[in-house]
Amino acid sequence: MEGGGGAPAADAVMEDAAPQQQEPQQQAAMGIENIPATLSHGGRFIQYNIFGNIFEVTAKYRPPIMPIGKGAYGIVCSAHNSETNEHVAVKKIANAFDNKIDAKRTLREIKLVRHMDHENVVAIRDIVPPPQREVFNDVYIAYELMDTDLHQIIRSNQALSEEHCQYFLYQILRGLKYIHSANVLHRDLKPSNLLLNANCDLKICDFGLARVTSETDFMTEYVVTRWYRAPELLLNSSDYTAAIDVWSVGCIFMELMDRKPLFPGRDHVHQLRLLMELIGTPSEADLGFLNENAKRYIRQLPLYRRQSFQEKFPHVHPEAIDLVEKMLTFDPRQRITVENALAHPYLTSLHDISDEPVCTTPFSFDFEQHALTEEQMKELIYREALAFNPEYQQ
């Protein structure tokens, strides 16, 4: 896939697109060499002071280090691994064990991403071991470094050709085919979870919400971003399938083509209304998968007539419209599968079944079946760090 296989020319694509690191980079660029760095723990570790945040990694991550992003979980820096000569994105998850839900999310992300091995799924390059096993509160995960994400591209005034959008869609589906074949649902696909580099390679990231495909408990922990949420999730269906990710892909692709969110709902009720205004009120036959409460709720809503996608989005290729309509189907049982989406005429120029691998061993969520304490989760993450750094065994 390395930018070949029908990839559009990428030279100018990322030029204007504000990359993930744009803002912090500008703040830091002035004194990038001046980010204070101190060797610690007998020179085995190095501490950086990033805007008042202590960032402590193994000494192989030499200066300079660059802040590239910030989130609720903590801070992300690009760093250079002097042993592998690779630039990576190191995410610090501060106070990772303060509550069980966050700790489990971090453990899930690590185990899942380490299990995956695919060009369109971001890879973990390292988990930094803690300097002291007994005081282990922050987790540092090093991922392969990408240039930007789809959210930044959509927000920028970077011109995107039809070929670019098509190639991004193809890569999302190619990665999703692999993820689903591992018996995993991503459950939180959105533009900011799709990373890109200057070569137009796309990688899916953030598996903290992922679930096994056969699991039926409703999402109790975190709220998936509403705008990309399938109707069955909005209606609290506990019996959701891989089709939830396909719905999200349809929303993302139309946002890419239209440069604005397809269904920017303000709340649950508004979200459902927006999608029905476009795809129409579902028929009785389409309600079969819902529980009685959800059916009753739908029946009392105003009747919406389905709009013509072709008329609403005249600038979008008719074959792309056909594929999106099959993705944005209300009834998940009728929604197109990832395999069939890859084989759709719109993607003929890119589709190559011999180059769309599946995962040979399904992922096991067994570690979630036990009520693990924070200490047990800490121990499991510590072991994951040692798998990358056996010499740090304490």
Curated annotation (Swiss-Prot):
InterPro entries tied to this protein = Kinase-like_dom_sf, MAP_kinase, MAP_kinase_CS, Prot_kinase_dom, Protein_kinase_ATP_BS, Ser/Thr_kinase_AS
| Residues binding ATP, per UniProt | I68, G69, K70, G71, A72, Y73, G74, I75, V76, K91
- Record Pfam families: Pkinase (PF00069)
Give the cofactors, semicolon-separated. Answer: Mg(2+)
Q: Catalytic activity, per the record?
A: L-seryl-[protein] + ATP = O-phospho-L-seryl-[protein] + ADP + H(+); L-threonyl-[protein] + ATP = O-phospho-L-threonyl-[protein] + ADP + H(+)
Cite the domain annotation text.
The TXY motif contains the threonine and tyrosine residues whose phosphorylation activates the MAP kinases.
Q: What is this protein called?
A: Mitogen-activated protein kinase homolog D5
* Biological source species: Pisum sativum (Garden pea)
Q: What is the lineage of its organism?
A: Eukaryota, Viridiplantae, Streptophyta, Embryophyta, Tracheophyta
